[in-house]
UniProtKB/Swiss-Prot annotation:
Pfam families: Transpeptidase (PF00905)
Signal sequence extent: 1-23
Name under which the protein is recorded: Probable beta-lactamase YbxI
Positions of post-translational N6-carboxylysine modification: K79
InterPro entries in the cross-refs: Bact_Transpept/Beta-Lactamase, Beta-lactam/transpept-like, Beta-lactam_class-D_AS, PCN-bd_Tpept
PROSITE patterns, per database record: BETA_LACTAMASE_D (PS00337)
A biological-process GO annotation: response to antibiotic
Originating species: Bacillus subtilis (strain 168)
Reactions mediated catalytically: a beta-lactam + H2O = a substituted beta-amino acid
Domain of life, source organism: Bacteria
EC code: 3.5.2.6
Amino acid sequence: MKKWIYVVLVLSIAGIGGFSVHAASSAHEKHLNVSKMNVDDEFKDTDGTFILHDLQKDQTFVYNRKRANQRQTPQSTFKVVNALIGLQVKAVRDEYDVKRWDGVKREFESWNRDHTLGSAMRESAIWYYQALARDIGEERMKTWLHTLSYGNEDISGGIDQFWLQSSLTISPLEQETFLEKLAKEELPFDKPVMKIVKRMMIQEEGDHYTLYGKTGTRLTDMGLGWFVGFIKTEHGSYVFVTNVDDSGTKAKNITVDILKKYGLITS
């Protein structure tokens, strides 16, 4: 009898302890004042900028504001815009629309196969989105980038190259403005189009959050990396932009570390 009482007590204490951890984490996020965040430790080995905007409280944190205002090439974060435009003008039907691999061996093995709009987003297969940009065409692309006020709106670098270390540039703060409108579904696209692209951006889902994002890397030297997106939690939504002198993977790792630190990503 005493043994069973002991087991019940241990299980009860463990349950209470687990609840306390979640409750503390949840409370941490609920009372988060993003304007008072500190991310110095996360950037001690990397030059970069980080932006977090609390959509409910309309509070914004910016680390390294000077860099946050500097325009740089969007790299593969432009896939988000490319997909939105492609779906809107019906250059592609949906996230399952297949393009056949042309047999050319490219940088990453995961690119060397047939892809859909969705799989090419997840694997960041550049060739698929280059083909999509050609299908959209210069005139429609110019019109839409102007409508969106997307960075400097310059596609002179070529219809399938302009976002890749070329003519199109955008600042991290401009990226945040664009992503905020996407998160709220306030961009000038049809609602189903925005929902499809947001679904393709899902990086991971937990019991209490969903993380949406897209990386971007300057492949010529791995010296420019982005991770942009938003996270939905039990208490609200937050838009983030990370830009570093490193790879997109590094930018994502820094972002996830910060989101965990402040209780937005919970186990």
